[in-house]
């Protein structure tokens, strides 16, 4: 034929096989009993109805096949790419079985022609059917309902972009009766954990197994060992991942045949599922992170990760666990013997109870630590310390970056908590006593200690202020010692905290990361942004003082106002001893001492009045005309009106040498008694 190359299709298939052997352009990952095979979805779909039905839309992913196919799946894969099937008398039965289940008709025909007298389907079914009838039963087109149910329940670990909140696959669906033979009869299975039987009645039941249809194999018990994929519930910190980590666990499924149902071949994938689902497990959802579980028991264990509770404690060594299963495994390893185990130094024969102590001791002999910095001479005992050193001192980037805001973190857990709190607004850790939500486990523990247990063990030696954490105390001590260890490399200004230095650096770079969602205005700090939103874009004054009833738009303004009622003025002038509630007021006051000539400060009203004598409060309610000239109430009234110089003669005021200027008034006045009629001048 003109214009055609008959060997073109053969050459293309050969090139695809070479790509498969090199792992090039392979978009399919097949996990068969722990062995990983790379292939092309297009080739798999062309050769197998099994893959064509599931991945006909071209969606990439990975499929987990039964471990029984591990020895012969490579032969089938070679057949897909070369057309040659290496059959022997030893592997013929296994290849035929796999070809039936994966729906590869050409491979089935080759197996039958290789040994036409024996049939795996006939030997296993025990019904006396010839091999041809058994093969036809596998190759015939099932109904749409059967095929949909079959392929919906296959054990797929799809690598898609959407987060998976449910465990795969969920037991309890009737279609899983058709996948039991696909997974195969395994030889061993883990026994159900005894702790699940010892839990409370409302949560001790694991998900009920499905009732599989079909007759049992002759000479075998009515049990199948099915490999399912469930969520890894190891003892560790809660991690809100976009993709659920899956592990393989063996679960025993009891097969209960029904007397009314017809006898079907055990190996058939087209067995119709039962319509009755009596006692099927209903998924339950976590109210905090909306993760779904198959039973209340798993939900109860999962909630402990939000609360940080570890109720199961080893009586021998005191180690605690989230789950009782982990405690039983720990006890099975004979923790008492492990605690009595000693480690001996090979140089000086000194013994240690812990391996880490021995490693630290060996440094005294060798002078070398296992982890060395490549940029300097420092050495470390742990890899995480070396990583932290490289980031802080040598500018190495943090390994885990946030895709939304490009912020980097040392660990994946920190990144996931950051995404949940900052970008999704989730606070996954909930206090069981008051319902308070925290963004981290450490924040929840701090809340419990401070609010419910009143534990503040770290006390300042200067002002007796107590703190829940030692780091907060150390930061507070810098206000007394004047230590400012963080210095700007551009202008040399020093700060007490790294956060303050970061805020200052934005004044040099011009960065304004906090933007208003209502207008185009941007801010360098979050506090000014909140005040801007409260004053510009929120109606009303929702925050009010419970003492005097004054209302405010921003909660920070209310906090400053309450300090005046309490008499708290922590910003003190070093020149004259005046105290102020805000640092801005202190800076404005310092201008008095800087200016020498032609300074006439603006008269300010009295901002707050603290009266310790209750009798003065009653007298203060009287009209000013009824009071005597020398009483304190007239002075207070004059101060509030801002006209002290015009209402009182100069000789009525007591002179103080500490006053730097006669026109400067203290912004607060504490009155304990009436002012005398005559004052010495």
Swiss-Prot record:
SUPFAM superfamilies: beta-beta-alpha zinc fingers, POZ domain. Zn(2+) 6 binds at residues 573, 576, 589, 593. One of its GO terms (molecular function) is zinc ion binding. Residues 121-134 have a biased composition (Polar residues). GO terms for biological process: positive regulation of DNA-templated transcription; regulation of RNA metabolic process; telomere maintenance via telomere lengthening. Disruption phenotype: Deficient mice are born at Mendelian ratios and do not display any obvious growth defects. However, the percentage of MHC-II-positive B cells is reduced in Zbtb48-deficient mice. GO terms for cellular component: chromosome, telomeric region; nucleus. A zinc finger (C2H2-type) spans 284-306, 343-365, 371-394, 400-423, 429-452, 458-480, 486-508, 514-537, 543-565, 571-593. InterPro entries: BTB/POZ_dom (IPR000210), SKP1/BTB/POZ_sf (IPR011333), Znf_C2H2_sf (IPR036236), Znf_C2H2_type (IPR013087). There is a cross-link at residues 140, 256 (Glycyl lysine isopeptide (Lys-Gly) (interchain with G-Cter in SUMO2)). Residues 194-208 have a biased composition (Basic and acidic residues). A zinc finger (CCHC-type) spans 312-337. Keywords: Activator, Chromosome, DNA-binding, Isopeptide bond, Metal-binding, Nucleus, Repeat, Telomere, Transcription, Transcription regulation, Ubl conjugation, Zinc, Zinc-finger. Zn(2+) 2 binds at residues 314, 317, 330, 335. Zn(2+) 5 binds at residues 545, 548, 561, 589. Residues 26-89 form the BTB domain. The keyword Zinc applies. Zn(2+) 4 binds at residues 373, 376, 389, 394. Signal peptide: none annotated. Zn(2+) 3 binds at residues 345, 348, 361, 365. Belongs to the krueppel C2H2-type zinc-finger protein family. Plays a critical role in transcriptional regulation and chromatin remodeling. Acts as a regulator of telomere length. Directly binds the telomeric double-stranded 5'-TTAGGG-3' repeat. Preferentially binds to telomeres that have a low concentration of shelterin complex and acts as a regulator of telomere length by initiating telomere trimming, a process that prevents the accumulation of aberrantly long telomeres. Also acts as a transcription regulator that binds to promoter regions. Regulates expression of a small subset of genes, including MTFP1. The C2H2-type zinc fingers mediate binding to the telomeric double-stranded 5'-TTAGGG-3' repeats. The last C2H2-type zinc finger is required for telomeric-binding. The two last C2H2-type zinc fingers are required for CIITA promoter III binding. Interacts with EP300. PANTHER family: GASTRULA ZINC FINGER PROTEIN XLCGF26.1-LIKE-RELATED (PTHR24399:SF54), ZINC FINGER AND BTB DOMAIN-CONTAINING (PTHR24399). This is Zinc finger and BTB domain-containing protein 48. It comes from Mus musculus.
């Amino acid at each position: 034929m003109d214009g055609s190359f008959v060997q073109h299709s053969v050459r293309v298939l050969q090139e695809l096989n070479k790509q498969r052997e090199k792992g090039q352009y392979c978009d399919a990952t097949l996990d068969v009993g722990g062995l990983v095979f790379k292939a092309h979805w297009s080739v798999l779909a062309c050769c197998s109805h099994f893959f064509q039905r599931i991945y006909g839309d071209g969606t990439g992913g990975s499929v987990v096949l039964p471990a029984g196919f591990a020895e012969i799946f490579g032969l089938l894969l070679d057949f897909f790419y070369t057309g040659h099937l290496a059959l022997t008398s030893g592997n013929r039965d296994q290849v035929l079985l796999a070809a039936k289940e994966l729906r590869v008709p050409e491979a089935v025909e080759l197996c039958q022609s290789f040994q036409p007298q024996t049939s795996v389907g006939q030997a296993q079914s025990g019904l006396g059917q010839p091999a041809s009838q058994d093969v036809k039963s596998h190759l015939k087109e099932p109904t749409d309902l059967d095929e949909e149910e079959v392929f919906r329940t296959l054990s797929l670990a799809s690598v898609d972009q959407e987060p998976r909140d449910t465990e795969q696959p969920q037991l309890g669906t009737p279609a899983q009766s058709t996948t039991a033979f696909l997974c195969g009869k395994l030889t061993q299975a883990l026994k159900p954990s005894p702790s699940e039987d010892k839990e409370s009645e409302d949560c001790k039941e694991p998900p009920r197994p499905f009732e599989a249809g079909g007759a049992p194999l002759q000479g075998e018990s009515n049990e199948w060992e099915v490999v399912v994929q469930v969520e890894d519930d190891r003892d560790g910190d809660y991690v809100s991942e976009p993709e659920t980590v899956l592990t393989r666990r063996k679960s025993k499924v009891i097969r209960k045949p029904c007397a009314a149902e017809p006898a079907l071949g055990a190996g058939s994938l087209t067995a119709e599922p039962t319509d009755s689902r009596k006692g099927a497990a209903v998924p339950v959802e976590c109210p905090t992170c909306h993760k779904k579980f198959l039973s209340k028991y798993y939900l109860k264990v999962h909630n402990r990760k939000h609360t940080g509770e570890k109720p199961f404690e080893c009586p021998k060594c005191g180690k605690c666990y989230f789950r009782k299963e982990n405690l039983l495994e720990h006890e099975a390893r004979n923790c008492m013997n492990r605690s009595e185990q000693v480690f001996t130094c090979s140089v000086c024969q000194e013994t240690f109870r812990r391996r880490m102590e021995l490693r630290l001791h060996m440094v005294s002999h060798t002078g070398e630590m296992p982890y060395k910095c490549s940029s300097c001479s420092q050495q470390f005992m742990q890899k995480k310390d070396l990583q932290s050193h490289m980031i802080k001192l040598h500018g190495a980037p943090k390994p885990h970056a946030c895709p939304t805001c490009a912020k980097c973190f040392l660990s994946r857990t920190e990144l996931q908590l950051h995404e949940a709190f900052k970008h999704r607004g989730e606070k996954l850790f909930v206090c069981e006593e008051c319902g308070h939500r925290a963004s981290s486990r450490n924040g929840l523990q701090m809340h419990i200690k401070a609010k419910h247990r009143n534990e503040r063990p770290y006390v300042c030696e200067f002002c007796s202020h107590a703190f829940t954490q030692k780091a907060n105390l150390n930061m507070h001590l810098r206000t007394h010692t004047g230590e400012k260890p963080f210095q700007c490399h551009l202008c040399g200004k020093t700060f007490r905290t790294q956060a303050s230095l970061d805020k200052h650096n934005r004044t040099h770079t011009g960065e304004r990361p906090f933007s208003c969602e209502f207008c185009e205005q941007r801010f360098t700090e979050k506090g000014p942004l909140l005040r801007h939103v409260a004053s510009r874009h929120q109606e009303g004054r929702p925050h009010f003082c419970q003492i005097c009833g004054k209302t405010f738009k921003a909660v920070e303004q209310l906090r400053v106002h309450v300090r005046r009622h309490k008499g708290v003025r922590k910003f003190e002038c070093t020149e004259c001893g005046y105290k102020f509630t805000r640092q801005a007021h202190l800076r404005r006051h310092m201008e008095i001492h800087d200016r020498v000539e032609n300074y006439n400060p603006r008269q300010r009203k009295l901002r707050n009045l603290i009266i310790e004598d209750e009798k003065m409060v009653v007298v203060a309610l009287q009209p000013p005309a009824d009071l005597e000239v020398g009483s304190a109430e007239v002075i207070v009234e004059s101060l509030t009106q801002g006209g002290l110089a015009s209402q009182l003669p100069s000789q009525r005021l007591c002179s103080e040498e500490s006053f730097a200027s006669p026109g400067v008034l203290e912004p607060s006045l504490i009155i304990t008694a009436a002012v005398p009629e005559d004052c010495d001048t």
